[in-house]
Amino acid sequence: MTCKTCPFETCANSEYCPAGNDICYQKKWNDHREEMIERGCVANCPQMESHHTSLLCCRRDNCN
């Protein structure tokens, strides 16, 4: 499984996920200046926190 890893809306960078981390995720939030994006691989979908504007979890290569 590969997941995108860059903190931009358009993302070309991917990484192979370690064994057991078969979920790609993307979190978005605003830091009062711009929209921030975090992407990567996880074993379990992270929790949506109050400051997040969106949370995506998926199980296909580069789906985040």
UniProtKB/Swiss-Prot annotation:
SUPFAM superfamilies linked: Snake toxin-like
KW Secreted (keyword) present: yes
InterPro entries per UniProt: Snake_3FTx, Snake_toxin-like_sf, Snake_toxin_con_site, Toxin_cobra-type
Protein's name in the database: Frontoxin IV
One Gene Ontology MF term: acetylcholine receptor inhibitor activity
CC terms in the record's Gene Ontology section: extracellular region
Disulphide connectivity of cysteines: C3-C24, C6-C11, C17-C41, C45-C57, C58-C63
Origin species: Micrurus frontalis
Localization in the cell: Secreted
Tissue: Expressed by the venom gland.
